[in-house]
């Protein structure tokens, strides 16, 4: 009976509006004003009684009114559906866009049930202000209220009892009690929705103690006729005043009197008022009862637009929907869209009111409708246990003038529409493509279904043009809808670099099905690309630009303007017949197809021109490369000739030395012979110097060649062959003569196999004071220092030679030295476990700098270090590199390429000849290359612990000589002449030798894990070998036994323990979907989710940041797979479990 009284006033005004809408609206407004004068309704209390999901649109905004939903409210209030004899109104559309003129809040005087009275006026056009008000209504959230709600029990409604208030609610809402009193008590005053004051006594007593409302409560229960099951709401407003509200339990209505209007008459009144207002654009009044109505039927225009054009609905789409729970709580339930059809295809055809058929995940969660409207749901594209949070980038700040009003409206209404999503590029793991909205990202895999949906939606609007009641509104609305859809599609094309541009243009403009995706243009235009080698083909594919972004945008805008202009030109008038309208639609469709085909041809032509230009550019580059290679080959052949001439000159010098030594007694008797030999030597030197100058002139133009051409592997191969020939000749000459000689060599390389090296007992230490040095500190020892070894009697101690004849010095480390027949006794066991080291020689008459160091770019495997403090710049007094080498080829940074500082010997100053008794005047040139196997096998720690012992065991030289050698080497390499160093004692100075180097320590090689980490909340992480198991069931059984949850992972309950894992592509998936072999190959770590975590994710739709605040670390490395470290930001809830999944 109470519900009937509540609906009597709306029904009466609706029937009157059918006869005269304007007069009924005026009377209703007058009646509401009179009622409002009697009792003002508190807005906070009204909304609290209405429910947490009810939000009334603001006055002056645009709304969408659905008569079908209004009729459902009448049926729900009367507990009776619409009868078949209720007439239909064909001129009444399924929805009306109206301007909200007024909203009045009311409450039933008998039941205290709340309802609202709204005055609406249909509009065909609307201004900017109304649209802005609708937009702002979505942004402005309703302020949080301090309240509590309790469902009354039988003891609460008894006349001799009191109202038991929950402890936390009493402490939060009520004023604090004075606990010094016994018992603590106070008097409270509260106002109901009709502004009536009620007085209660609040006392804290009982066993156990509890908060009670005693005196005055029985009067309130009897006055409001409350029963068990009803709910009482207590609100504390801004002025700290208490407000009382009532929510009645849903009960069957009592028998309705025959004098009351029947439900059929009420249906007729509602529909008649709406039809009259739509036909005359006149105001009409409706009543909205949030407690009786299944759902809102007056929707804010911005909310409707956002839901309709931002969500592309398809069958099988997952969604979540908010529902009200007990005591004014809310909860989201997950569901699936199972169908899209009209709720009432006879009366309301093509209506969007509850046209989605849905199925719910939890069948026993309460009574929920099997049909919903699109603006009531939130579509989701990922399963409930996935969280897309790591893929979000930082929001780019936008200005108000950057985008259109409608786009800003959507993004402000739903903030996650403006979030940007980073999509990983499958070709390049380091590159991302930000700037994609979440809606577009969710709908990437549904392009075909969205195309069909858009085509059907556009055809629906085209068909609506024939409706006389919608002629003025449909054209305006159609242009706006096309504009919004085109903008969304345009963003898709631009963000994906337009690889699917024709397909999306077909969706937007109904193109022909013969459109060719642009990612196939390369194979159509130039099929010969497949015959090229893989490198050039890949380079061409990467360099192809499908279409510039600005050009793609301009093409889409052009097509959009054309469609809108044609729609406006072809807008039918009310006097046109249906046949002419159909003919215009057909003509418009053909024109669109012709224009789109022309756009496709222009795109194909542009792609062909760009491809031809790229091919021409590549041919020019190839020609230039071939020309440069030819010049380098010629240069290599000329240098080989110089090597032969140098060898001849060395032989002559050797002969001269032998003749001087063997015929020292007969020098005065044979002067003509000596003069003849000297003349021959002088001629050879002149010829050699001329050849050097010619080679230098030919090599100067090669400095302009790109660095990529200098690394051509052809030249090192030719030079290595020539160097090996030269080395063989020199070794054979040394063996024959038996006397160490000094060659003048233009090469600065030492063979990898290790040639014959002449070892001398004499050492030479030279100071370079003419030029700045790159060493850490300048040398202080001046003059020449010699140490004579008694064992090397066949070696000659030579004085410093003039710059024209001084040799080029390249000292080597221990492993580069291989013993000659002369050194068999000295070095019987060469150690091959020590990596080679190189120190650059010094050039004469050249300015210091990184370009003056020796370049090893001709080697296939070089050594490199950055800014080594032990590398020295050239000096005049240290020796001569042959004049045929230009200074531009000497690059310090390329010299130490691929070096590992912590596993190799320190470089030695070229001015120091005391490297294990090696005389720099008797050194030959050998190519130095990096031993790859040695680098991988050497361990830095082992090397540091045993270097001195290995040197002592493998190279048993004299102690005095070694001490002198070591001291000189350290002083010259590190600039510390007073450093104590003794290589004989392996227990000291190893750390000083290795740790005081100027090269930075190389990072330790990261070990590859062969076991998979498993995490579970509240437990220490474990590591398992996935390869041990044969399938998912065995793995689940092992994990359950490992973490003590046996029998809980194998059951099939809907909400229980879940296993998820992260694969090699950083995607989080549910365990058990992929084949077992693929899972074993791609799994990186596994996560066990508890039922509470699964339930929390089903509520929120994702794995929030506060689900796992305290995750235990793994026992192996102390790193959490779901968080960077356990002790990092322990109190920051924003550090979610998915921030770093590694």
Swiss-Prot record:
Keyword Protease assigned: no
Region (Disordered): 1114-1142
Function: Auxin response factors (ARFs) are transcriptional factors that bind specifically to the DNA sequence 5'-TGTCTC-3' found in the auxin-responsive promoter elements (AuxREs).
Induction comment from the UniProt entry of this chain: Down-regulated by auxin under light condition.
Protein name as annotated: Auxin response factor 5
Annotated GO biological process: auxin-activated signaling pathway; regulation of DNA-templated transcription
Organism superkingdom: Eukaryota
Compartment(s): Nucleus
SMART domains: B3 (SM01019)
Tissues where this protein is expressed: Expressed in roots, culms, leaves and young panicles.
Signal peptide range in chain numbering: none
Source organism per UniProt: Oryza sativa subsp. japonica (Rice)
